[in-house]
Every structure is written in C-alpha cells, then in structure tokens.
Amino acid sequence: MLARDFESELLGCRIEATAIGPFAIGRLRSRDAIQLVEAAVQKRQNLDIAICNAHTLLSAMDDPRYAATLQKMTLLNDGIGMSLASKLLREEPFPENLNGTDLIPRILANIGIPLRIYLLGAKEEQVRLAKEHIETAYPKHQVVGYRDGYFASDELDSLCQGINETKPDLLLVAMGNPRQETFIVENRSALAVPVAIGVGALFDFMSGAVVRAPKIFQAAGLEWLFRLLQEPRRLFRRYVIGIPRFLFALMKIRFSRSGVSR
C-alpha cells in the first residue's frame, strides 16, 4: 500500500481510514455512517462530521487553521476527486461516494430511531423549504428549529443557546466550507447536540433553489462538470484551476517520504 491506513474504534464501531496528506479519511459505506450517527445519538456522545471533496482538502492544504479544524472531525469522502486520490495512494477507490446530498437523505430514511433535527444555514427561504421537505419526506423525524446562515459573530452565544433549547439530536450546518466546519468545531463546547454535520449546499437542493445534475452526470462522477457548466464564473477557479492543483498535491504526497508507507 502506498498510503498509510489506520484502524480505530469510534462509538463502538471499527473505522478504517486512509491518510491523504495529514487527513485521515474514513473508508465507510452509507450503512456505516448511519450506524455511527445512531450510536452517537443513543449514547449522547459528540460526533462531528466533515464531508470532504477535493476542494475541501485543497483549501485545508492552503490554510493551516482550516486543516487543524478538519483534523478534529470525522472525515468522509465526497466525489470523484477523492476516489482518484484513494486509487493513486491506496490502489483502490473508497468503497462508496458519501456526498452529503445523497448521504443525509439515506441517514434520514434508514436510521432506526426518530431524530430531533436543527437546520442552520443557507438563505431564509431555502432553509424553511428544506425544513418542509424533511418533514414531508421523513415524517418520523422532527425539525425542532431552523435559521439561516447569515449572522454576526456577536450573535453566536444566543444562536448556540437557541439551538440547545430545542434539544436536537442532529445539527445540519449548510454554510459552505470552511465556514460550516469552523462553526461546528469552534462552538462545540457551547453546543448540546451529539451529532453535527457540515452539509454544504444540501438545503439549496432540498428546497429546489439549485437543480442537481442529471443522473447520467451523477453516475459518471461528473456532477462537478455540470455545476461548472451552470456557474462557470463562480466555479472556474475551484475546478479548472483547483483540479490540476489537487492532482499535483496528490503526486507530491505519493512520492514524498513523509506521505508514503512501504
């Protein structure tokens, strides 16, 4: 194996992970993630999840503070870039693509316990519609509170207090990275919620504000290309410049003595 692999135990579940640079990415399937979330809720133990794509890791490689934040979380893989990284460094892909747009609905549909859910992020209209979608599609769960992701730093104390007053089991934070992961980690001691997950644009998809890529793009791992075609100016730097940079970073890891285990 070219990459360092790890095994550890989290909430009574055996977790295998592969190192991509300084980041240990869990080699999980959806059912494993569901088991983790359920165990954390039942045991009232903290579980903070960051769903990482190539852009996430590249951003963290450029920002030591963000890197330190991610290293305090349970990291899951998202997208073809991460699959490529695993193939290059471990000689096999991750067992499943755990992008949040698919993973969160699978958790809500298949978890064995009812959840009290708080939604934080996106615009007011989008998060409200996401609440309605969850309540309609997954009626065994209760959305106990929600608010948009536009708040000032001096509102953090009251925001965390308001979240805690709803007694949630699951906090979904949709503010993009690095902001959503930074919020979770920096406010963890003030939050009385066992599970917190950064979910990116999930509320935009749930509300219908953003159209998801057609199935053919999803199956081919090319959702990023569809998004680039829809928003070329906003996403040009992320994909057209970011993808080659990520590939170069992977090659450095592969051939670096500090990143290779033989």
Report the location of each language-model feature.
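A short, gly/pro- and small-residue-rich
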Residues: 64-72, 181-200
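A transmembrane-helix-recognition feature enriched in membrane-embedded lipid enzymes
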Residues: 83-86, 213-262
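Proline-aspartate-enriched helix->loop->beta-strand connector
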Residues: 163, 167-173, 177, 193
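Short glycine-rich anion-binding loops that position phosphate/pyrophosphate groups of nucleotides
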Residues: 53-57, 175-180, 202-203
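N-terminal nucleotide/polyanion-binding subdomain common to many enzyme families
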Residues: 1-96
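Short, flexible loop segments at boundaries between secondary-structure elements
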Residues: 148-154, 194-230
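Structural motif
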Residues: 49-51, 76, 170-174, 197
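Conserved beta-alpha
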Residues: 83-162, 166
